Amino acid sequence: MDYKIEDLDISQRLDELELTLPDSLTFFPENFDTANAKSDFIFTDSMLDLSKIFLQDNSIVIPALGQDTELYRSRKSADIYLPAIFFGLSQITENQTILSVSLNVLSNYIYDLCKGTSGKKTAHVDLYIETKEKGKVKKLSYKGSINGLKDLDKVIKAMK
């Protein structure tokens, strides 16, 4: 399992984009750090599928940061790129299972994509986890196997 954890202060960036810190699960754009406006946000194309899966299978609505968007990045690669997801501290605190449910949905999605294919697939995902300090988040960047994704639950719980 290959992952990297960064401490970020996103409050200033959110102010620049005229956005507020979400308090629930939210898809983050790939270009959050570099976009000039929320209309420039680019999301991973798998966000559309995952949004439907979260809603249909788990009754979880996950909005995109900045709401509606028309810009999606599609990659032609053997690797699987998942959308960045923000976890609000209040949601993690109030609903202890939200992390494991979310990671299971992501793992199952990747597993379904890999059915019938040969070779090893690598998953890429960024998770933003709000900390107790206002506007501060920990960004967990994961690159690894499908099975390793489920183990991120322990890593995230240790970060709180």
Label for each model-derived stretch:
Residues 69-126:
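Membrane-inserting effector segments that mediate pore formation, membrane fusion
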Residues 48-55, 86-90, 111, 150-157:
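Generic detector of well-ordered alpha-helical segments enriched in charged/polar residues
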Residues 3, 14-16, 81, 87-88, ...:
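Generic structural signal for short, flexible, solvent-exposed coil/loop and linker residues
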Residues 109-160:
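Amphipathic, membrane-active segments
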Residues 35-37, 64, 78, 84, ...:
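A sequence-composition feature that detects small, non-aromatic residues
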Residues 1-73, 132-139, 147-149:
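Membrane-active, amphipathic/fusogenic segments and juxtamembrane/transmembrane anchors
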Residues 40-42, 76-78, 152-157:
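Surface-exposed beta-strand edges and their flanking turn/coil or helix-capping segments
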